[in-house]
Structure formats: structure tokens, C-alpha cells
A protein has these predicted regions:
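Juxtamembrane intracellular "pre-TM" segments in multi-pass secondary transporters
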Residues: 56-65, 246-276
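Helix-breaking motifs and short loop linkers at transmembrane-helix boundaries and internal kinks
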Residues: 101, 133, 154-160, 171, ...
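Conserved MFS/SLC helix-loop-helix module at the cytosolic interface between two early adjacent transmembrane helices
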Residues: 120-156
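Helix-to-loop junctions at the C-terminal end of transmembrane segments
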Residues: 122-133, 323-335, 418
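Paired small-residue
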Residues: 148, 159-167, 360-368
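Cytoplasmic helix-loop-helix junction between adjacent transmembrane helices
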Residues: 164-202
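Helix-loop-helix hairpin linking two adjacent transmembrane segments in secondary transporters
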Residues: 189, 198-245
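C-terminal transmembrane helical hairpin of 12-TM major facilitator-type secondary transporters
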Residues: 337-380
Length: 454
């Protein structure tokens, strides 16, 4: 008779029922007082103990504890896939302007509609995942996400290209919103901050790699074939996530529309959710506005950078990826409100430095700006996950709706500013957005956090 081998014994949540775990999943339950011999079809007994499997015999479940490096890597990989295609065209905007004979506003809209699609779909994706499950939504979104990327290589006009970029954005929340809800359900609060840091690092790396790869590949083989290669890379990512992402263990389907509407009404009266959404709006406003139009500035005199050199500018994202895990330490030491305020102030300093003429100073300004934004985003997401217990995926969806709408507004308003006043106008617009974000932190978020007040 085979009993459970290589299992780690723990107490149950109630502290009375001993459980044995395998790969972080409860594998069997030990019951006392059973008679010798078979105790039934579902469990076997020996020496007064019965071992009842909690998983069907022969079922292989890919599951990892939150401390597993492989699971953290999977979380970061999904974040990278989500943002690899979203901003990739920023590195070739000057080329696209020439190819489609578009002006600054039209090309800015091609960037902005992607994040607009993300914002519009975020709340609805939250409702759908509440009904159908997190893992299914994540894998489906990655698959469909690769299709409009491939089709955009054949777009004949700037209008059709912009429409396809909008469709790219439609599928991104299926990865971002559902993954955050998945983590919030599957793990305890002490693990969420570290997992969120890995997720944000993944999004940072994905944002960098999409721009970097498209810029360099375009220099070698042209932008159309480069888009096809990036689409194939996303499809490969779909297969890897389908294989590696563990099934949900604590998900309970809640398909009722009435439940979702009650959660929506509750969130719309929740100062924590509303203030986080408002802050998220101005965070992505700044990031998209800055990195969409810094390339137009650097493609002009006196820099005249080509597409590969412009792609290299986004290496500042790698520095942000290295520094962003510090958000976990900052959150533990200072709390979310102080972390948000410090990181947003750092971003303001970076924007001001970007006005300098030497390319190295511009580069340093972009490092400070992006690092501040990444830490603010990580702190805000953790703030929502820790303070919202009911309708978490819908709350996350509302946050991302505001976050991505901010990116759309940033692309449009900064395009108008660049068209009228060049980079100085963009900097003025970004500083206004950052100052409003600081006002939200000190006037609302600070007041709702006892730790910040203390």
C-alpha cells in the first residue's frame, strides 16, 4: 500500500486538522480513529489513521508556493507579454509618421487608442473573469492579443493602423486585471507585495523589450516584418503560460450581474478606490506623454537619432526594473502614501531635468521619471489589493480603466503641446499632471491611511 510520499506536513487553517502539502497544494488529509483496512473508495487507512486525497488520483497540477522562483518568473513573464506590444511603436514613431504621412496628433492617437482600448475593457474583463475564471481569461487574452499585431503590418492607412492598435489594447486587460485578481485570491497579503513587484518588473521589461526589439529589427528588416516577428513571439508566450500557470484553487464563480453591479456601486462610493483610480490616471498620463514625444524631440536637431538609437533610449526601463523591487521595502518601511509621494516627487525631478540639452542629462532625467512612475504604480496596485476585499477584480478593473484613460489623454494632450510648443510644452503638461497626482496623495490617500497620519 502506497501512502503519500515526499509530503510536507502542516496544520489546516483551523489549526486542528493535519494536512500534507505537495508543491504548495493540499495533497491529503489525515483522519484519526479509523479502523484498520479500507476506509472507503476515496481514502485508505492504516494503524488507526486514514489518508484521504484532496486531489483526484493521477491528476497533475502545476502549482507553486509564492516563494517559488518559477512561479514568480511566470508572473513577471505574463506582465512582460502584456506590455510588449502596447508601446512598441513608440520607438518607430518618426518612421511611421513618414510612412503614413501623418502629423503629430494622428501618430499620438495611434499610441493613445491602444491604452484607450485597455481602459474601456478593464471593468468588463473583471466581470467576465468573475464568471469564467482567471486562468482561462489570461490564456485566451494572450492568444487573441497576437492577431491584430500581425495584421497591423499590412495596414494601408494610418486610420486602419490606428484601429488595429485599438484592438491590441482590447485584449491586454485579460492579462493584467485577471492576473492581479488571481494573485489576490491565491495568496496571503504578506506575499502580494513581493509578487506585485515581480509583476511590475515584468511589465517594465516587456515595455522595454517591445520598443527595443521593434526599433532594432526595423533598422535591419523593416517595420512590417518586425511586427510579424513580435506577433509570433506573443503566440509562443501563450503556449508557455498555458503550460506553466497553475490553476486557480480559491476561485469561486460569481456570474450574477446583480452582484457585479452591487460591487460597482460600492466601489464608486469607496474613497480608496476612487483616489487610487485618479492617481493612476495621472501616472500613465505622464509615462505615455513623456516616452511618446521624447523620441520626436531626439529625432530632430541637434540629435538626429535613427530608429535603433531611439530604441536604445528605452533602456532606461531596465534601470527602472532593477530599482522597482525597492517598492516592497519602501512600502514596508514608509507605507503606501509616503511611498507614492516620494516616488512621484522623484518623477517630477526627472521631467525637469529632461529639459537639458546634453543627451546624457536627458537620459538621466528619463531614468528618474520612469523609476518614480514604476514605484508609484506598484504602490498603488498593492494599496488596492490590501484595502479592497470584495469585488477585487472589478476594483482592479476600475483602476486600470482610469489608468489607461490617463495614457490616452496623455498621448493626445502632449501631442497638441508638442505640435504647438515642442518639448517645452510637453514638459509643462507633464508637470501639471504630476502636481495633480501629488495633491490627490496628500488630500485623499494620506487621510485614509492611519499609518501615513501616524
Amino acid at each position: 500500500m502506497r501512502l503519500c510520499h515526499k509530503l510536507r506536513r502542516r496544520q489546516s487553517a483551523a489549526g486542528k486538522i493535519p494536512l500534507f502539502y505537495r508543491n504548495g497544494v493540499p495533497a491529503c488529509l489525515i483522519l484519526r480513529g479509523c479502523k484498520h483496512g479500507r476506509a472507503g473508495e476515496d481514502f485508505v487507512s492504516s494503524g488507526g489513521f486514514a489518508i484521504m486525497p484532496l486531489l483526484p488520483t493521477g491528476l497533475t497540477v502545476s502549482a507553486y508556493p509564492p516563494s517559488s522562483f518559477l512561479f514568480r518568473l511566470t508572473v513577471a513573464f505574463i506582465g512582460a507579454l502584456a506590455f510588449m506590444q502596447v508601446y512598441s511603436i513608440q520607438s518607430i514613431l518618426p518612421l511611421l509618421m513618414r510612412h503614413f504621412q501623418a502629423d503629430e496628433v494622428q501618430i499620438g492617437l495611434a499610441v493613445g487608442v491602444t491604452v484607450m482600448g485597455m481602459g474601456l475593457m478593464s471593468p468588463f474583463i473583471g466581470m467576465l473573469s468573475d464568471a469564467f475564471g482567471r486562468r482561462w481569461m489570461i490564456c485566451s487574452a494572450i492568444f487573441f492579443y497576437s492577431l491584430p499585431v500581425a495584421l497591423s503590418a499590412y495596414a494601408p492607412t494610418i486610420e486602419s493602423f490606428t484601429l488595429l492598435r485599438f484592438l491590441v489594447g482590447i485584449f491586454v486587460p485579460g492579462m493584467t486585471v485577471c492576473l492581479i485578481a488571481y494573485l489576490g485570491e491565491e495568496f496571503e497579503s504578506e506575499h502580494i507585495g513581493k509578487l506585485m513587484a515581480f509583476y511590475v518588473c515584468g511589465t517594465v521589461f516587456g515595455g522595454f523589450s517591445g520598443r527595443f526589439l521593434l526599433g532594432h529589427l526595423t533598422q535591419w528588416i523593416g517595420w512590417q516584418f518586425s511586427m510579424l516577428l513580435l506577433s509570433g513571439l506573443s503566440f509562443t508566450g501563450f503556449l508557455l503560460v498555458l503550460w506553466q500557470l497553475p490553476p486557480s484553487r480559491h476561485f469561486v464563480a460569481k456570474p450574477q450581474l446583480s452582484t457585479a453591479m452591487r460591487s460597482l456601486v460600492s466601489h464608486l462610493h469607496n474613497r480608496i478606490v476612487l483616489s487610487s483610480c485618479a492617481l493612476g490616471f495621472f501616472v500613465l498620463f505622464s509615462l505615455v506623454g513623456c516616452f511618446s514625444f521624447i523620441n520626436l524631440r531626439l529625432a530632430q536637431a541637434p540629435y538626429h537619432l535613427n530608429t535603433a538609437q531611439l530604441a536604445n533610449i528605452f533602456s532606461v526601463y531596465l534601470i527602472g526594473m532593477i530599482i522597482t523591487p525597492a517598492a516592497t521595502w519602501l512600502l514596508r518601511k514608509f507605507g503606501a502614501p509616503r511611498t507614492m509621494a516620494l516616488s512621484l516627487a522623484l518623477s517630477v525631478c526627472g521631467i525637469v531635468i529632461s529639459l537639458a540639452q546634453p543627451l546624457m542629462l536627458v537620459f538621466c532625467g528619463l531614468i528618474l521619471m520612469s523609476t518614480g512612475v514604476f514605484i508609484t504604480q506598484s504602490a498603488t496596485i498593492s494599496y488596492i489589493s490590501l484595502h479592497v476585499r470584495e469585488g477585487r477584480s472589478l476594483a482592479t478593473g476600475l483602476y486600470y480603466m482610469a489608468y489607461y484613460c490617463g495614457g490616452t489623454a496623455g498621448a493626445w494632450l502632449c501631442a497638441l503641446s508638442f505640435q504647438t510648443w515642442q518639448w517645452q510644452g510637453v514638459v509643462g503638461t507633464l508637470l501639471l499632471a504630476q502636481c495633480i497626482g501629488l495633491i490627490i496623495i496628500f488630500s485623499v490617500i494620506w487621510q485614509t491611511s492611519p499609518r501615513a497620519q501616524g
